């Protein structure tokens, strides 16, 4: 049985820009909290980054549920493309960046989010599925890959991956899609 839902499912405020500012503030609070968690060494840098990834990814994944227009989410993405670029360039917000390797995920994620919201906003279910995969499968693959032997490593461009991490990404993605 195929069915379609009407989006958004919930409008927290009459004006969408209030929702935008609440989400923006929430994301900034999460980033600041991650800095504190990193300084207090409550989590390892990679675990801290994964937790931030999941929380912020969940916020943006839910954007079609709380916004009628792609404009507020696209604006949010644009703001974080700029903020993440400057934070990365100036070695700020280490709680959201990988500590052990050079990665650009914190810059690529909002770029991908921007493209998806602008180009595919009318395909809400696909947007939610694709963002869910990025939000959930990526940190699971990272965790599995880091906690397995290095005997099964391979390199894509300059990134080292493991067969186990790749399998975890595939399995998680399959579960999300179906």
Identify the meaning behind each predicted range.
Residues 4-22, 32-72, 84-177:
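Interhelical loop and helix-boundary elements at the membrane-water interface
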Residues 26-30:
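Glycine/aspartate-rich loop-and-adjacent alpha/beta segment that forms the canonical ThDP
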Residues 77-83:
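Glycine-rich nucleotide/cofactor/substrate-binding loop typically near the N-terminus or early
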């Amino acid at each position: 049985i195929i069915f379609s839902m009407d989006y958004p499912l919930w409008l927290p405020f009459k004006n969408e820009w209030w929702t935008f500012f609440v989400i923006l503030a929430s994301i900034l609070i999460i980033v600041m909290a991650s800095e504190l968690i990193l300084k207090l060494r409550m989590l390892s840098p990679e675990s801290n980054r994964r937790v931030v990834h999941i929380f912020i990814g969940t916020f943006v994944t839910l954007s079609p549920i709380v916004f009628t227009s792609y404009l507020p989410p696209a604006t949010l993405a644009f703001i974080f493309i700029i903020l993440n670029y400057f934070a990365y360039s100036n070695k700020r917000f280490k709680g959201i960046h990988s500590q052990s390797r050079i990665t650009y995920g914190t810059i690529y994620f909002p770029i991908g989010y921007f493209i998806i919201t602008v180009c595919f906003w009318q395909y809400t279910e696909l947007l939610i599925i694709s963002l869910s995969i990025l939000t959930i499968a990526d940190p699971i693959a990272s965790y599995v890959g880091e906690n397995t032997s290095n005997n099964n490593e391979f390199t894509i461009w300059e990134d080292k991956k493991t067969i186990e991490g790749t399998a975890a990404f595939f399995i998680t993605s399959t579960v999300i899609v179906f």
